[in-house]
Amino acid sequence: MENKTPEKSNGNNAEFLRIENITKSWDAVTAVDRVSLTIAKGELFALLGSSGCGKSTLLRMLAGFETPTSGKIFLDGKDITDVPPYERPINMMFQSYALFPHMSVWENIAFGLKRDGMPKDQIESRVENMLQLVQLKPYAKRKPHQLSGGQQQRVALARCMAKRPQLVLLDEPLGALDKKLREQTQLEVVNILEQVGLTCVMVTHDQQEAMTMSSRIAVMSEGKFLQIGSPSEIYETPNCRFVADFIGDCNMFNGSLIVDEPDHVVAETPECKHYVGHGITGTLGMDVSVAVRPEKIVVTKTKPESEFNSCQGEVVDLAYLGSYTTYHLKLKSGMKLKASAPNIDRHHEGAPTWGDKVFASWSESAMVVLTS
């Protein structure tokens, strides 16, 4: 998974949404556990985690559908913790889209504006503007069942934005779409939100979706934030084993620290010695994990010269995936190692194949040492 470069801006960096020590508990179950967060105006922020991690509960508290057990929520400097949903300048778009099947696209977008008593001429102008923004003007008279999944998603987004809320909440916004359409729609949604300049918080369990769409990500587990950062920070420098393993594919070598210098460390695992080109906060002999992404590993039939950062194994499986090939190696220690290589040439003569004895190696900057 690769994020677009350069990375998306964090809005204008002015604090807009602030969450202070929010907790939500039901009897003995704590769904959200003392989380704090600030989000800038115009930022697209993702809450990422597996089912049951607390991300949707947090989103519902932002919307006002759930009341925090403790903590505060501030929007544009105002305490909205106890403000009911219908009085919050916030709109939420659900995974199901919740479009009215008996209404046309135009009528769906206009619905909230009519409920608010907006003058007819202003409604017409606003709806036309939204239709143009989401590129659905030719479909204004169609009913939802006459649209594709991606078009329905854009109608729901237009309806969500039509009232010009201060904050937009997206709950698994693209979960109902197939993979190819989902990937295409991700960038469309980002472009629309950026054009309008809205601040957005989205919930997803899809790592690629979070990394493609958001400027920053909070990885959640058991009601807590484990790491908050840009997509590249989360992917390249995870701060714990869970984040490294949850975001993308990762090979985890478990061992102990045998050299601890300010500019480098050496960790020893059953597979090999790892020379890591940066220091860590730790002590000799402590248990560590060395994380290496598959795409940072080079697979060759010849043994590397260095005594560090390489190990021997056998190709037990491989998967040709078009743009790259993934090798599954069984190392002497019994560990299964995953390595990915780009398919630069159409036919790569001499490339490793099933049953080959090979060497896997990686650079000193390809690793992250994890202590928790």
How would you label these PLM feature ranges?
Residues 4, 250, 259-372:
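Non-catalytic connector elements of ABC transporters
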Residues 26-30:
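Short coil-to-beta microelement around the adenine-binding A-loop and adjacent beta1/P-loop entry
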Residues 44, 85-245:
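ABC ATPase nucleotide-binding domains
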Residues 48-50:
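The feature captures the beta-strand-to-loop junction immediately N-terminal to the Walker
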Residues 63:
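Helix-to-loop junction immediately C-terminal to a conserved catalytic motif
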Residues 71-79:
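Conserved ABC transporter NBD signature motif
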